[in-house]
Amino acid sequence: MRFRSLIVALVAFFSLAAKPHAKTTAGDVFPDIQHERVDYWVSEFSTDHDYHKKIADGLARKPKYQKMIQRKLRERGMPQNLIWLAMEESAFDSIACSRQKAIGIWQLTPDTARLWGLKVTKKIDERESVEKETDAALRLLTHLHERFGCWYLAAAAYNSGEHRIARIMKKTLGREKGRDRDYYRIWDKLPGETRDYVPAIVALKRIGKDPAKYGF
């Protein structure tokens, strides 16, 4: 299974490398679909002391990377508000490190980073370059969008793994590709963290439109 996953990722990587600015469908957006979990996270981020501090720090760091990320999103025809995925991953902390050894603002693990074109060795770790890690993360997200057909499922796969999301989609809906609302049709089949991953991104996007309204 691991070998097959490696082959799939390598084929996708070299396909995207051949067309480095492959564009998604014009007009694609990461929509704000109303759901109680989005409202829940807006409230949590706004009122919980620890969450509020993390989000406030992230909003303060965001301008440092915003122009670069939005330029790269624009070049690829990707939704500008995918920048909030990085906020959810790391609050734009370039030295953030997880227990799974994911680092950087996009929190790529060593294996994922290598699969999507970055050097990760004992001497060199290109995830430490925000620009290079952004390129790798956007290549991965482009691949996931092409596989699943919408950004909600692509984001879920970014968090939980594409093969898991593919299995859940096939078992629940009989297909891999879907629409953003299908995320909530498979919601109860998702791992706990992934159930709140997309709602949290949408909540951050909502807060980012008017931070003062939410106490930031």
Model feature map: region roles:
Residues 120, 144-155, 175:
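Inter-helical turn/loop segments and adjacent helix faces that build the functional surface
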Residues 21-48, 97, 111, 121, ...:
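Catalytic and substrate-binding regions of cell-wall glycan-acting enzymes that process beta-1,4-linked
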Residues 51-66, 75-78, 98-106, 126-137, ...:
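Solvent-exposed, acidic/flexible segments
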Residues 209-216:
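Helix-loop elements that line ligand-binding/catalytic pockets
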Residues 100-122, 130, 134-141, 175-177:
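Substrate-binding/active-site groove segments that recognize
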Residues 67, 71, 83, 135-142, ...:
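Solvent-exposed, polar/charged alpha-helical surfaces in well-ordered, non-transmembrane soluble domains
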Residues 2-6, 10-77:
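An acidic, Gly/Ser/Thr/Pro-rich helix-cap/linker signature
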